[in-house]
Amino acid sequence: MVKRPLWSTRIRESWAKAPIVWLCGVRRSGKTTLTRDLPAQSVHYVNCDLPASVQMLRDPELFYRECRREIVVFDEIHQLEDPSRVLKIGADAFPKLKILATGSSTLAATRKFRDTLTGRKRTVHLTPVAFDELGDFGAATLKKRLLHGGLPQPLLAETLDPSFYREWLDSFFSRDIQGLFAFHAPEKFNALFEYLLRQSGGLFEVAKAASGLGISRPT
């Protein structure tokens, strides 16, 4: 596991200002790995992907009362039905707890995540590996970073694997787009995504893109 001290420091600094740290970022950017870098003896880790965790958090107050650790990590919190309620109860009723919640950066744009946490949280947006972090990734160079991309797994790989990003894109659609926004046309999403990549840095004309891709403007 590659340690990323830059981000660990940002999390600790954010806790000094608010009880909740919202760690967001694109899929596979290293959010879960970063939570594992916290001292295990101080952390109560909850994987919200698991049905048992969802059931356990139906009564957030009871969950917090039974917690014996000073840090609670909710990994993939957007899998919960009402994540903002779980976080708000923790911040208001158990102010001594430090809470770290991870999830997709698209979650804030959904109705599922109402902004009822004003003054209670700080956001840390985990980016792909930055230039200043290359030293933490061993033999990674700027050239390799540009060729392999900035996600930790392909950056650590010895050879370029295009299938990783195809799998990543499929996962991004099924869990972040389809799951959160109920959008059910993967071929249209992929076409738009590739179009945006080709247009990177250029002007995006909605009407022109819709016509060229055969996608309606509202979509």
Place the predicted regions along the sequence by residue:
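Conserved lysine of the Walker
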Residues: 31
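Conserved catalytic/switch belt of AAA+ P-loop NTPases
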Residues: 84-107, 115-116
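Pre-Walker A adenine-sensing motif
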Residues: 1-15
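Short regulatory helix/loop adjacent to the ATP-binding pocket of P-loop NTPases
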Residues: 107-122, 138-139
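Hydrophobic positions on the alpha1 helix immediately C-terminal to the Walker A/P-loop
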Residues: 34, 38
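Hydrophobic anchor at the beta1->P-loop junction of P-loop NTPases
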Residues: 23
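Interdomain hinge/linker elements that couple catalytic modules in large macromolecular machines
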Residues: 125-219
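Short glycine-rich substrate-engagement loop in P-loop NTPases that contacts/grips substrate
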Residues: 44-74
